[in-house]
Structure formats: structure tokens, C-alpha cells
Amino acid sequence: MDHFFIKRKRNSEVKYTEACSSSSVESGIVNSDNIEKNTDSNLQTSTSFEPHFKKKKVSARRYNEDYLKYGFIKCEKPFENDRPQCVICNNILANESLKPSKLKRHLETQHAELIDKPLEYFQRKKKDIKLSTQFLSCSTAVSEKALLSSYLVAYRVAKEKIANTAAEKIILPACLDMVRTIFDDKSADKLKTIPNDNTVSLRICTIAEHLETMLITRLQSGIDFAIQLDESTDIGSCTTLLVYVRYAWQDDFLEDFLCFLNLTSHLSGLDIFTELERRIVGQYKLNWKNCKGITSDGTATMTGKHSRVIKKLLEVTNNGAVWNHCFIHREGLASREIPQNLMEVLKNAVKVVNFIKGSSLNSRLLETFCSEIGTNHTHLLYHTKIRWLSQGKILSRVYELRNEIHFFLIEKKSHLASIFEDDTWVTKLAYLTDIFSILNELSLKLQGKNSDVFQHVERIQGFRKTLLLWQVRLKSNRPSYYMFPRFLQHIEENIINENILKEIKLEILLHLTSLSQTFNHFFPEEKFETLRENSWVKDPFAFRHPESIIELNLVPEEENELLQLSSSYTLKNDYETLSLSAFWMKVKEDFPLLSRKSVLLLLPFTTTSLCELGFSILTQLKTKERNGLNCAAVMRVALSSCVPDWNELMNRQAHPS
């Protein structure tokens, strides 16, 4: 049948045939056979090389307000092109349906009973749809804002360490009163959508879980970390173990609250280690080999012959961690050595405080008396044997109010009044006030966050040298007492017998000598040998010359890195502006060996001051009225240095109360 049809050549085939024909003419070969061959070959090649045809671009249709008479409005959802939405069934059609014929067909087939409805009818339907859309979006926004507000209030309550019921009984009612007064009742009603009642506790637990997950995720990445731990007994007679962690993260060290453990069984080293193992390895899935430092006090619970918690922890770290005895605890132990005569003065001062503070009537009478004569202070401070270094403040208050206390004791006919009539006793009290204030100041310098071992060692060594200097001053022919301002003022304002003053000077000299010996015992020089060998960590730019670097016992690669680092003026500027830990974290890419060695030296804690702070907050939270409170979640939120990711928390479904 093919011979009955006339086949037309494609344009490309015609052009190709003409080209072949012209080439044949130019070559002088013109015959029908060549033309047929060329044509056949052209047909074969044309089947394998199809020409490219451009598709016709279809433009998107736009919505027209006249389409409302067919019952369609423009859909408010964020589509790429305009799409019609039926005001009756709310169906959304494709962009291609934006034709009057297709829209009319939808109305006739789906809603035939509404064909004769006037335009006003569809306008009312359009208005109803817009109102419902606005209501839903507004309700969603209010619900999300209410949920976020609930989280923020719970976070603030936990950070301020106040009772959870304060949010429901004080904060929310107060906010309602303020908004209702300043704005109107309608605005105040929006606050009622904020979840309340018992929701604050649930929100705090959720935030605590979120913060814990954030911290553990970081530690599970295999980074090095160090811990400090301490145990104490709260008001509910529950033994509590607090653990803090310091880890290298991004461009510096971070310190955070790791865990809060209740030790329910009898307190022993095995109990503490078992609970730690269960939490750190069992629950958190952390590797003890990444622990590079352990810091605790020197109590028998931690380091005793039978418990040996520290020994067990060092074993599970394969001795890859170092143990540091808390500097503050060691200073407190060293400060307890006092000669007998000075100890008697201290005991009598404590008796005076207990006589007045032990009776509410005596305390009120002294307060009234001090207020009437206009003293700067009206109360005495309690003496606690555990907080040994707080005696600086206690003795300072007694010495400041010595005349008022003397008059009060005479009125009370107490035998303790006679000690204030003894100039020798008052002079010794002035010295004890000064020396304990100095020790208390040293203790405060050893506390705080982000302190390194070099700073603490420098302060301890500086104090030991100061003690030696004071001894030399007192041994001279013309002794100087400038270092004890209250003592110096007292002997200048009062006539003190020269022989008595010499006796007091000998007792002071004996006390300073005893302090030097105890500080040398608790802070031996051999413990600081590692720091002296790695003094380049403290100041790497002090070793610019090769001769000084050779004496540091570094491997050749480390020597080369230190020489290159100390020659960089740009890094010297960073060293002067950044903290020591931040500086070594910054150069870890360029000087990995030195950075790694420095981080391992700086990472361990030097004190357990963070644990002490945690116990103070625990005392604030767990009052006598709330002695059965489980403070784990609140402690996490109150002490964590991580900031919650509110967007992640908001992804949880809101359930307004």
C-alpha cells in the first residue's frame, strides 16, 4: 500500500539532499545513482539524528476577581502559581483550571443547586472562609506563644531557685492584674492560655532532659573531659553526690553540671563508685578513657584506706587521669594549726558569739543597743567549725563590736565580760581577725570558674613567700606590723606594755612559722615539678631562643612547634587577649602536639568550688518545708551552663491547660 501514498521529506532531509547534490555537482559527478545513494544515506542518518524541537512555553494563569461569581476565590496557601479554591466545598483546583468554562463546569456539576445564587451569596462565603482561616492561624500562633511563655517562665523559676508554685500562685496572677490594668480584659484573657497548674514542674523536667541530652551528646563525641565530685548530706538526711565536668568544646573549655546522685545505701567508697559507674557508663554511655582529670577533697570517703573511690576511678581510666586534691580544702587544713594561747582567744570569742546568738532575747537586745548608738553592724555571725575560714568574718564582727559587746555582757552579768577588759586578749583578737581575713581572701581567690592550675599554684607560692617575708619582718630589731592593719591600729591607739607586746610578737611569729610548715606539707614542691617542666604552657613566648627550648625536655617535633609559635607576633596578640585555655584551643590546627599537651595539663579541675556552690543551691531549694523534694531536674536547669534550644523544645506538641 505504500506506493499509493506520497511521502514528503522533512526539512532537514531536503537541506541535506540539496547539500549532497551541490557537492556532487562541484565534484563533477552528476548522475541519478549518486543522487539516490545520497538520498538513501541521508534517510538513514536522519533516523539516528532527530532534530531538536522546542516545547511551547505555557504561561501560568492569573486569578480574576470575576471568578467569584462561579464560587471561586484565590487560594491563600503559598503555591507557586495562582490556584482557585471553591468557597462551597473548599476544594483547590490546579492552575490550568483558571478558565471560566472549567470553573463554571465545577459549579454546575458539583453544586448545581447554587447556580442561580447571586454574587452576594458567594461574597458572604468568601468572608466566612477568610475569617475561619484567620481564626485558625491566630489560634495556632497564640498556642505556640503560650507554650514558649510557659517554658520561659519555668526556666526562670528554676534559674532563680524559687518554688515551682510561685509561677502559678504569684507570677501568672500578677501578670493578669498588670495586663488587665494597663490594657484590657481581652489581652489578659490571652495569658490564661499559658499552661499552668502543675505544668511548671513538667516544663522544668523537659528542659532538664533537653539540657542533659545536649551535654551528653557532646561528651559522647569522644572529646576529653575532667570531673570534680563531692558528697554531702542535705536537710532530709539524704547523702548526695554532685559531679561537674569540664571539657574542650569548639574554641575554649566549658564547665557544666554533669549529674546529681542520691546515695540511698550506707555511704562507702564502693557505693559511690557503683553509682558513678551506673550513671556515667551505663546511662550516659561515656568512656572512662576520655576522662583526663579527677578532683575531690581529701576526706576518708574519697581517699580512705577502705573506700578508695579515687583509686577505683583511676583504675578504670587506665591511669590516664590525674587526681588533684582540692586546693581550697588543703588551704583550710593548713590554716587550722594555731598555737595554744591563740587558740584560747579563739575559743573565748566563739563562747561570746554562742552566748549572744544562742538566745533570741540576747540577740534582740544587742541588736537594739547597737542600733541606738549607730554602729555599722548590729548582728554577730555564727561560728561553724566546718567553714573554718569563715572565722575571719566572725572575728572581724566581734572585734568591731567589742565595746558594745563588753557593755552588753556587763549588763547581763556574764563572766565573759572580763576577757574584753584584758588588753592582751583584745590585742591577740585583733591579730586573729587580720590573719583569718587574709586566709579568707586567699580562699576566695582560689574559687570561681575557668581557673587553671598555674594561677592557683602562683597564688599558693606567693602566699608562702609572703609568710616568710612576714617572719623576717618580725625577727628584725625594729619589727613591722603593716601586714596586720587592725593589730597595728590597736597597738597605736592603746598603750600596750612592751614586754606584753614582745610576748604577743613571739606568738605571732610562732603561728606564722607553723603556717609555713603546714602549707609546705599540703602543697609540697615536688607536686609542682610537672608545672615547672611545662612552664612553656603558661608563657610560650618566653622561649624565643633555641637554647632555652632545649632545656624543656621536649621531643624534636614539639621543639620545632614551640620555636615557630614563639616567633609569631600575631599569635602573641591572641595570647594577650584570650584565656590560656582558649589560646591553646585556637592553635590546635597549626601546633597539634603542643596544643594537645597543654590541654591535658589545663583540663583537670583544681578545686571543688563548683560542687560547694551546688550544695549551697541544694540547701536553698530543699528547705525544711520541702525536705522530700526531688531536686535533680531543678538542679540541672539551675546549674547548667548550656542554653536550651527553644526551637527544638517548641517542636513538641502544645497542650494548653
UniProtKB/Swiss-Prot annotation:
InterPro entries from the UniProt entry: RNaseH-like_sf
The family this protein is said to belong to: Belongs to the FAM200 family.
Name the record gives this protein: Protein FAM200B
Native source species: Homo sapiens
Gene name of the encoded protein: FAM200B
